[in-house]
Amino acid sequence: MFDELLFFSDNRPVKRFWFIALVGIFCAQSLFTLADDSLKSLLPVFGKPLKAAKLPKAALPKAQVELGRVLYHEKRLSRDNSIACNSCHDTVGYGVDGKKFSLGFEGHLTGRNSPTSFNAFMHLAQFWDGRAPTVEEQAKGPILAGGEMAMPSAEAVVEKLGKIDGYEALFKKAFPKSKPAINYDNVGKAIGAYERLFVTPGRFDKLLAGKNKALKENEIRGLKKFITTGCVACHTGNLLGGNSYQKLGVINPWPNQKDQGRFDLTKKEADKMFFKVPSLRNIAKTGPYFHDGSETKLEAA
């Protein structure tokens, strides 16, 4: 039930992680095997299998990834030098911090649960409300958010980085055509380049690739149930989510009505309580669940 994967992280080029395959968590009724044609016919809804990311060989993107790695772990990107991207999206914690709400500047609690940064660049958009189109744009948001890293302005970020030994050289190497090399857009571009290595393939992908013994029998039963009960209507594609917005509280009103989801961004009545559907990759390790962290147990979620 556990798969080994390779993942680029921290101060080492490669770090090993173990994660629980999504499909192993679900219960089911009757026995199905991969010889079952009905199951095989349903698998195309998940698309092509994920493939592990590789460090770029070309000098320029490699330099951008290296700069992004440093910036991702740089606490001095926060106003009080205490919070980095990695604080809430921990690369040794499956891209999350495991908290209902993350701690921001001066102990402020963020209003939403921190989603995993793993595989995030493949989502249709970033943040629970989709307000950033790419991980490069997303990376620039929390740094300036008052309740998160709380830097007063993009200019203040650039000035601060310019005074730290080593950054001038790293930025010039990563962005040789930029004048000046240290600018706020390049901060986002570098962090995004690093995050684009956060790909976590596993046994489920072996199944999608046609390897009949990739999953155990109970996992196959769970997958069959997952598909036939309609979970796949929202959690679809090879990320099992991350590619649509859906409404919470369709049958009964969602208990937390303070956060109106995409409505707070678009001001469109039709967007009330719509949130991005999270990916179920590594889901057993990325709780608590939902945008408000309201459920701690996966079975209940």
Feature map (PLM): residue ranges:
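Short glycine/threonine-rich turn/loop motifs
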Residues: 36-141, 203-301
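Central I-helix of cytochrome P450 enzymes
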Residues: 147
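Post-cleavage N-terminal segment of exported redox proteins
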Residues: 2-8, 13-65, 123, 141, ...
